[in-house]
Each structure stands twice: as C-alpha cells, then as structure tokens.
Amino acid sequence: MSETSYLTDPRVMETVLRRLDELESREAITGLMVDYMAATDAKEDKGIKVARLFTEDGSWESVGPHGNPGWAATGHEALIKKFDRNVARMPFSAHFVTNPAIDLDGDVARGRFMYFQACTYRGDQPLWIAGSYDNDFRRVDGKWLISYMRVHNFFTTPFDQGWVKVPHMDTP
C-alpha cells in the first residue's frame, strides 16, 4: 500500500478518529474531576457548581468502612442541597485529585481517582482527609458528566498545628 493510499484508507481514518476520541474523552473526564474539585471548594453557589457536573439523574454516595449513607444524594436538587450545607460545615477546603485510571466504552466510562483534602471543619478544626473516587461517567450531547460518584474515605484526621493556628509558615 502506498503512503498516499494508506493516508486515505477509510479504515485508517476510522482508527485514528477512534483513538483521538479516546484521548479526548480521557482528558475531558480528568478535567471534569478537576472541575468537581474546584466546585467543592467554592465559597458561593457550591451546590449549583457541583450539580452541573452531574447527569440529571446523577448520584453521589459515601461508601466503605468510613462511609456515611446519610450523605447520599441523587438528582440535581438533592446534590445542590447536599453541597450547599457543606459551606457552613467546612468554611475552607482545598481538594486535590490524582492518579486517574479511566476505562472507556463508547459514551460511558468508569474512572478511579485518588484525592487529598485539607479543610477547616466547623470553623476552627483543621483536618486532613484522603480517599478515592470510583465513578461512572456518561457522555450527554457530546459532554462528559458524572453519573454515579462513589467516595471511599480512607481517613479524616485532625492536624493539631494546622493552618488555623499557623495560617502561613515561611519556607525559605
């Protein structure tokens, strides 16, 4: 097969387009999780910012030995309520997401991520929180959204001399 015919072969183009879609989908899903982290750290309109990242029927659930079934939420209205009540509980939070592992199957995907969070609980209690996400994603009208988020909390632990008592430490 000549180079010219190879480049114009529809099978080659189909393979290239499929691979491009996979790369773009992985990047979009990773970006979606970064957007989720930023939304959960928002001081205003937190619930709306989080809910818009989920499908209309999207669910959030806390699972595992440290899970809290009372925090489960399904649908935009429930997600907004759930995340808006976090503003008073945690007036400061900084979420970080790492280690994406994404499996794609057309317009659905499964993604696993690790997270770390520094936060202030109930006004003056500094905490470290870490865990993982095991999420289902669905592409709706060309946009990837979270359809089911499972949050597995590894630990929530006080940090005795955290950012509340020492807001900034010089590190020359």
Describe each model-derived feature in a short phrase.
Residues 1-42, 46-48, 52, 56:
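Short, low-complexity N-terminal intrinsically disordered segments enriched in polar/charged residues
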Residues 46-115:
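A solvent-exposed, acidic/Ser-Thr-rich amphipathic alpha-helical stretch
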Residues 38, 60, 151:
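Active-site micro-motifs of SAM-dependent methyltransferase domains
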Residues 2-17, 88-172:
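A beta-strand edge to alpha-helix "cap/lid" segment located at domain peripheries
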